[in-house]
């Protein structure tokens, strides 16, 4: 039969999606009523009032039309100032691109530095979206396991994974899902490797304001020789509780930012116009950031102390972000079995085998409320110690 006349024939989608995973998504759906949710990496705090009132004011003032695609000059300048103040990163406002969330900034960065079949090193386990993003544009993710004792990079493993197709190293410190914060010496060595092999560094710094234990955030862009090859990624979602407002940015060398601007010009155009000024105002809400951080610090202490003495669980005290990465192999259960058992006990958890290198671990978000953390601890203890 002539295919053109067969109305039951359906065209197929591109093969690039055939093996594309969705990471933690199945476990990020709202759980049954009454179940404590320890899964979503989303601040439970309300967005700072100055941000809300500014966004509303901008809407009422008619800021609903097209605007400068790269971001308003005032916002780009504010981001450059913020990077210097908080991370000692020196960047010109012209080399900042405001994006619809940090995810979009990541995608633009990968499109900027990777040609088809180029390899990208991921320090595994890593955030669930890095690998599929790289794959979808034709890049090749190369997962390099971190040290499972503390989740810090194994430099020898990084070096041995480099080939003539390697183009970039992905850095995420503080790290989702492990909570690791890389030391200055580790960042310096990663930069040294990148210089030696002429590689780009994509540095996801979305959790840079959430560091515990008196640690410090060190960006590869602040290390000698690193600025010229590092694209910094960050955004407003985690620090200022603005996940649904979708504002992020990338900053880096001129040639990389110019290419990323072209990506945005031919896709999203720009973030919502009324969010430009609201995002700028958020950068001045330091009192909210301090209050949020104090709450996370307390919740981290509660959850670690509440779970660390349970037989079969191995807990590494998280150094940053708001995640706890728990080794459950000592319980005799797989991570999926553990998550299923926890759900029956009334706590929703994420089995980390859904991402490369996460087998045997559970990811917990202590961005949950203090009340939910206390109740979740009680339920898990009752289940595991009965």
Regions found by a protein language model. Give the residues of each.
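PLP-dependent class I/II
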Residues: 1-17, 29-36, 42-58, 74, ...
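Short beta-strand to alpha-helix junction loop
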Residues: 70-71
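N-terminal signal-anchor/first transmembrane alpha helix
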Residues: 20-24
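Glycine-rich loop-to-alpha-helix module at the N-terminal edge of alpha/beta enzyme cores
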Residues: 38, 62-64, 78-86
């Amino acid at each position: 039969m002539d295919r053109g006349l067969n109305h039951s024939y359906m065209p197929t989608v591109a093969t690039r999606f055939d093996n594309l995973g969705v990471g933690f998504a199945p476990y990020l759906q709202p759980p049954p009523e009454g179940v404590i949710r320890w899964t979503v990496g989303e601040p439970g705090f309300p967005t700072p009032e100055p941000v809300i009132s500014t966004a509303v004011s901008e809407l009422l003032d008619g800021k609903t039309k097209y605007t400068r695609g790269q971001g308003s000059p005032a916002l780009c300048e504010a981001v450059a100032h913020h990077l210097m103040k908080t991370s000692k990163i020196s960047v010109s406002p012209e080399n900042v691109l405001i994006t619809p969330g940090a995810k979009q900034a990541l995608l633009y960065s990968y499109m900027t530095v990777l040609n088809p079949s180029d390899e990208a090193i991921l320090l595994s386990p890593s955030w669930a979206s890095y690998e599929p993003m790289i794959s979808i544009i034709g890049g090749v993710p190369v997962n390099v396991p971190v040290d499972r004792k503390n989740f810090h990079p194994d430099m020898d493993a990084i070096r041995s994974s480099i080939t003539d197709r390697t183009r970039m190293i992905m850095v995420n410190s503080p790290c989702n899902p492990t909570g690791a914060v890389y030391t200055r010496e580790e960042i310096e060595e990663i930069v040294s490797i990148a210089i030696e092999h002429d590689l780009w560094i994509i540095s996801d710094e979305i959790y840079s304001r959430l560091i515990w234990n008196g640690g410090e955030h060190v960006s590869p862009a602040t290390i000698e020789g690193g600025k010229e090859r590092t694209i910094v990624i960050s955004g407003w979602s985690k620090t200022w509780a603005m996940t649904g407002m979708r504002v992020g940015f990338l900053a880096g060398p001129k040639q990389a930012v110019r290419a990323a601007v072209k990506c945005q010009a031919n896709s999203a155009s720009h973030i919502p116009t009324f969010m430009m000024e609201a995002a700028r105002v958020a950068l001045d809400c330091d009192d909210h950031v301090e209050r949020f951080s104090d709450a996370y610090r307390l919740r981290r202490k509660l959850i670690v102390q509440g779970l660390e003495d349970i037989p079969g669980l191995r807990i590494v005290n998280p150094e940053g972000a708001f995640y706890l990465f728990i080794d459950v192999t000592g319980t005799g259960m797989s991570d999926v079995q553990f998550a299923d058992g926890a759900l029956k006990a009334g706590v929703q958890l994420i089995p980390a085998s859904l991402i490369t290198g996460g087998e045997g671990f559970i990811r917990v978000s202590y961005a949950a409320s203090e009340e939910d953390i206390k109740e979740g601890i009680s339920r898990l203890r009752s289940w595991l110690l009965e």
